[in-house]
Amino acid sequence: MPNRLLISFILFTLTLTAKAQVISKTVFLLSEDNRTVQSIFIRAGESTFLIENYALVIPDYFEGSLTYYDRFDGADKEGKLKSAGNINYDYYDRYDGDDIKGKIKSVGDISVSYYDRFDGEESMGKVKSIGGINFGYYDRFDGDEKKGKLKYIDQIQVNYFDRFDGDESASKVKTIGQVSVNYYDRFDGGNRAGKLKSILGNSKTLVVIESKRGL
């Protein structure tokens, strides 16, 4: 995805170490329709994590030599990155269940967990924790506008407009932490209704970016 590299160069250097600490910076990239969060960069201590579609993924570039799992490591790991420099990667396999098979299990000594079928279909297969960083999702009791969408990352709450806010903004991202996301409505005239109007409240520690800016 081309916006990964652009955002990472502008906001911080992607460096993985063996220890996850308190979150110092989080960057949220909205989806094209502004209804969900497409990508998340989390900086914790000297570690940086990239989450896409609610799963931890590996960045596009590394420092140091790369090694990969081969056929002797099993079909669920074969061909996947094993190490980058002094950082080792491990993955869940078929014995861990189909919900999480093939997903990243650990980065160095940082464990990664995912919600499974026992947590409900709204969160099944989505990242639950990265080290001490916790993720939560809305469920069916929160309504169709929010069901399955990101609810929080630690203390950062994510809220969405609902049907009572009008058709133009219904189900779109409303706030992420102290950052507000605003949309044009029918009173603004023309063909702008429902389009992104502004993102207010970005700070050094929390940034929200519209999808188009990352391309």
For each of these PLM feature ranges, what is it?
Residues 1-23:
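Bacterial Sec-dependent N-terminal signal peptides
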